[in-house]
Amino acid sequence: MPVTPRQPYGGDLVFTAFSGSHQDAINKGFDDLNEVAARTDKNVDDVTWEVPYLPIDPKDIGRTYEAVIRVNSQSGKGDIAYIMKTDHGIRLPRRMQIEFSKTVQHVTDSKGGEMNSKQLWDLFSSEYLDRAEPLQRIDHSLATADNGDDAITATVLWHGKECEISGTGNGPLAAFVDALHELDIDVSIIDYQEHAITAGFDADAAAYVECEVNGIPVHGAGIASSINVASLCAVVSAVNRALTELDE
């Protein structure tokens, strides 16, 4: 006998929220549960269930959270951020959430339907992690300059040609930004965030930059086994996104 999608509590969509505002409220509810658990030193499963639009915990009746939030053209930044965090260990900064949600909305509007977790990750990767033109980091080494600053020597591909650039600064990120001046790339860092990745990848560090590249405001992201490498990859990501936009 078929079960209607919204039939409590066996329907496929009984816990699903399609509205962006509902999804955002649910995401904030999950965040509150985790905050209470951390503050009271409890397991999150032992915290009193109080999540908007979900009168009971799906896990209590053998369901999962997978179907709770569906990504579609109505989805807001909060629900997209929730899936990126819970499924992929990626904690996007707020302004980057806004930027990426616009990309997701553009794709779902143009293609219709929904995006699953894998499709969301593939879109994030293609937008932020996989761009290798016109700049690609190959390797780098760090030393200490005479004034105590970090000195970097980086091997990069620039428009397909391998070259070596050098710079100094207060930290590896600032030194790399200084080195990019040799390629006539001006990067001004507005915000930088980093965290350890807690789920789903061999890599264990993620870095995000909000910056201006030759006057163009842009975000970048990098993932690597080293936070230093991840931060440089985030700058490369921002450079490639900005210069690609300039070419278009």
Q: What is the meaning of each model-derived region?
A:
Residues 152-156, 197-220:
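Positively charged, aromatic-enriched nucleic acid-contacting surfaces
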Residues 170-188:
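A short, contiguous, amphipathic alpha-helix enriched in charged residues
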